Amino acid sequence: MRLKIKAIWVPTVPDIEYLKKLALRGAVNKTVKVSSSEFHKHTGDSSKTAARKLKQMEEERLIERKIVPGGQLIKMTEKGIEILKNEYIEYSRIFSSEPDVLELEGNVLKGLGEGQYYINIPGYRNQFEEKLNFVPFPGTLNVQLSESSSALRNRLKEMPAVRIDGFNDGERTFGGGNCYPIKVEGIEAAVVVPDRTHYPADLIEIIAPVKLRDALKLKDGDRIVTRVKKQGMEGQK
């Protein structure tokens, strides 16, 4: 009996270089036209090797590709973009002057009012008070992260977290999540990351004992920079 073994492609440095070159040409957000005979000049490989690697990247679903007269139309997939985001995270660690600091910046965004509802539920509110040592204002400050900070968001998992357990109030079940203690302009606060959420990955919710919008005179669209440290976090407008 013969066994068919399919090779699994693992990105190498040259392969990541291809993704980077495509991204620099705009293939992250749009479809770009690429000619193997021209593209290979930017990679150092032969045109034959460039054509083979682009085909391989399509097979691994790192790019979407369509052959057209004079070249091919290419757009990066979420999988390909994620590889570059991970590269970005690693480089940020290498060149950060404070390796234990995570800086997230974004713009204040109008919320949907859900934060007020959940914070007022005793099963959550009591845990916030007990574990975070403050009674949160009934509402959250929503911040939409910039593209670069969105790529770094996964590093929150490396920071010390306060676990908020899920519970059942007799009528329905409420899920758990993690809180990351922070300071925003000297105000005790926390980033709330539910286990399950319908919010996009580039949105973070911050709770505090005061209404941060009023305390920091924030309005929709204002830029806020938050520095997350392994022993806490500080933020600034």
Swiss-Prot record:
Cofactor(s) for this UniProt protein: Mg(2+)
Involved pathway(s): Cofactor biosynthesis; FMN biosynthesis; FMN from riboflavin (CTP route): step 1/1
GO biological process: FMN biosynthetic process; riboflavin biosynthetic process
Molecular function per GO: magnesium ion binding; nucleotide binding; riboflavin kinase activity
Binding site for Mg(2+): T140, N142
Region (Riboflavin kinase): 102-237
The keyword Magnesium appears for this protein: yes
Positions contributing to CDP binding: G111, L112, G113, E114, G115, Q116, V210, K211, L212, R213
Entry EC number(s): 2.7.1.161
Binding site for FMN: T197, E205
One Pfam family linked to the record: CTP-dep_RFKase
Cofactor binding notes: Binds 1 Mg(2+) ion per subunit.
UniProt keyword DNA damage, yes or no: no
Domain of life: Archaea
Unknown as annotated region, ranges: 1-101
Listed InterPro entries: RibK_CTP-dep (IPR039063), Riboflavin_kinase_archaeal (IPR023470), Riboflavin_kinase_CTP-dep (IPR023602), Riboflavin_kinase_dom_sf (IPR023465), WH-like_DNA-bd_sf (IPR036388), WH_DNA-bd_sf (IPR036390)
Catalysis: reaction(s): riboflavin + CTP = CDP + FMN + H(+)
Key words, A-Z: Flavoprotein, FMN, Kinase, Magnesium, Metal-binding, Nucleotide-binding, Transferase
Functional note: Catalyzes the CTP-dependent phosphorylation of riboflavin (vitamin B2) to form flavin mononucleotide (FMN).
Family membership: Belongs to the archaeal riboflavin kinase family.
Name recorded for this polypeptide: Riboflavin kinase
UniProt source species: Methanosarcina acetivorans (strain ATCC 35395 / DSM 2834 / JCM 12185 / C2A)
